[in-house]
């Protein structure tokens, strides 16, 4: 079995693959202070709950945008899984032609999403990942990673409103009913969601013009992808496991 880690700024997602099938997954909080043993206890408990034997893990691959967590996770893999993990970064085979000015600056999550997007949906395409930051990545007709845009995530935007406006409460991110709202909470939800939908549609519209290609597919992933995609005009597919799939594909490329 293959254990994959997608480590984001807020959460990390773990998945287990048997061949090309995702058989288990878990979402936990990314904690920069946790030691390898603390992660070992937490992950072992998750495995036990779902009857997963840690000794059945054959290999591990990690994608992380949080450098401070890598040491603990790598030590967890060595101590508890008895495996040296494959880490997405410079020198790893991805099969991706990156056209960035400095390819080393491209986040591991964006590379992994691009690999999965091309494999599953083809090119040209735009990949949107709704995480702590929302990333938009453009893939050319030739399957090249051209670059993209990074915007503040919707939760960051909502939290900034709460933190900066003393009389406004923290609100749940929920689908609004209308824009002419009758309460402060619904007014904030409407402004946050519809405002963010406008941001997404506008960036995708401009990116499509810059790609100058026919039939550009737009694929969204991330925790809030379904909520935003249901309101946009521009997202074609929502794939909640795009990053995990990309990790599996990259792992397989590095076994060839």
From Swiss-Prot:
EC number per UniProt: 2.7.1.33
Keyword Cytoplasm part of the UniProt annotation: yes
Compartments where found: Cytoplasm
GO MF term set: ATP binding; metal ion binding; pantothenate kinase activity
Alphabetical UniProt keywords: ATP-binding, Coenzyme A biosynthesis, Cytoplasm, Kinase, Metal-binding, Nucleotide-binding, Potassium, Transferase
Any one Pfam family match given in the protein's UniProt record, by short name: Pan_kinase
Details of cofactor binding: A monovalent cation. Ammonium or potassium.
Chief place of localization: cytoplasm
Catalysed reactions listed for this entry: (R)-pantothenate + ATP = (R)-4'-phosphopantothenate + ADP + H(+)
Names of the cofactor(s): NH4(+); K(+)
Binding residue positions for ATP: 6-13, 132
NCBIfam families: baf (TIGR00671), PRK13318.1-5 (NF009847), PRK13318.1-6 (NF009848), PRK13321.1 (NF009855)
Assembly and interaction partners: Homodimer.
Role according to the record: Catalyzes the phosphorylation of pantothenate (Pan), the first step in CoA biosynthesis.
Stated name of the protein: Type III pantothenate kinase
Lineage: Bacteria, Bacillati, Bacillota, Clostridia, Peptostreptococcales
Gene name, Swiss-Prot/TrEMBL: coaX
């Amino acid at each position: 079995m293959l254990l994959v880690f997608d480590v984001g700024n807020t959460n990390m997602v773990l998945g287990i693959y048997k061949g090309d099938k995702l058989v288990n997954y878990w979402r936990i909080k990314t904690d920069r202070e946790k030691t390898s043993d603390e992660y070992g206890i937490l992950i072992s408990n998750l495995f036990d709950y779902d009857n997963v034997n840690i000794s059945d893990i054959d290999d591990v691959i990690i994608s992380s945008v949080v450098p401070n967590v890598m040491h603990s996770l790598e030590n967890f893999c060595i101590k508890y899984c008895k495996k040296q993990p494959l880490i997405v970064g410079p020198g790893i085979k991805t099969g991706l032609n990156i056209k960035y000015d400095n390819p080393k600056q491209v986040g591991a999550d964006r590379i992994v999403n691009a690999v999965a997007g091309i494999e599953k949906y083809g090119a040209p395409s735009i990949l949107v990942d709704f995480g702590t930051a929302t990333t938009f990545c453009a893939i050319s007709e030739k399957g090249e990673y051209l670059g993209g845009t990074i915007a503040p995530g919707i939760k960051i935007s909502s939290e900034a409103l709460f933190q900066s406006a003393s009389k406004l409460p923290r609100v749940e991110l929920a689908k609004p009913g209308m824009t002419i709202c009758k309460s402060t909470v619904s007014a904030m939800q409407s402004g946050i969601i519809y405002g963010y939908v406008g941001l997404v549609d506008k960036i995708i519209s401009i990116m499509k013009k810059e790609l100058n290609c026919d039939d550009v597919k737009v694929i969204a992933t991330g925790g809030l992808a379904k909520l935003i995609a249901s309101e946009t005009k521009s997202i074609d597919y929502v794939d909640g496991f795009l990053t995990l799939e990309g990790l599996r594909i990259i792992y397989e490329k590095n076994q060839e």
